[in-house]
Amino acid sequence: GLSLGGQILLETLSQRKDICKYAIVESVLVIPSKFTYSMIKPAFGSCYGLIKYKWFSKLQFKSLRIKSNLFDEYYKDTCAIRKSDMIAFLQENSVYSLKDGIGECEATVQIYVGEKEKQSMKKSAKIIHEKLQDSFIQVLPNMYHGEFSINHADDYVRKLLEIVKRR
């Protein structure tokens, strides 16, 4: 799971310790920020309408460092998200924390974080690794948030297959 998807995966693993044998989490934030939470509604509330403009979406897209050939899909998907849903996703993402049950997870979990990500992401990766008994952490050189699975899908799949073959 990547980012918000990774939070959902970790939540599932904390509730159902034997749901899977292997899992990958990439760029997952587990350090809650009440300040960020409080800023999301006013910030996105006032500028949400801009995402419908391609020029603005291109700026946003560029900041995410996603392969350029994925822009049309990104634009379509982003425009389809309602304002209230976008705010809810971002707010929940900003206050997520690991649950105690995560320590009982039976899956082998590979944790990836980009070398060029924010410190909070790197710290989150370490926290996840410390809480999960059977986990491995890898800092990906020269990569930003979510770049591994999105921009390097072939390498990502290779790593996934390596994890499965190890057992």
Predicted regions and their residues:
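Gly/Ala-rich beta-loop-alpha elbow adjacent to hydrolase catalytic centers
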Residues: 1-5, 9
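Flexible "cap/lid" loop of the alpha/beta hydrolase fold
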Residues: 14-15, 19-50
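Conserved alpha/beta-hydrolase catalytic His-Asp/Glu region
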Residues: 34-36, 51-103
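Short beta-strand/loop motif that positions the catalytic acidic residue
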Residues: 105, 111-113
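Conserved alpha/beta-hydrolase "acid-adjacent" motif
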Residues: 118-124
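Catalytic histidine neighborhood in serine/cysteine hydrolases
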Residues: 125, 129-146
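Catalytic histidine-centered segment of alpha/beta-hydrolase-like enzymes
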Residues: 143-155
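C-terminal alpha-helix
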Residues: 155, 159-167
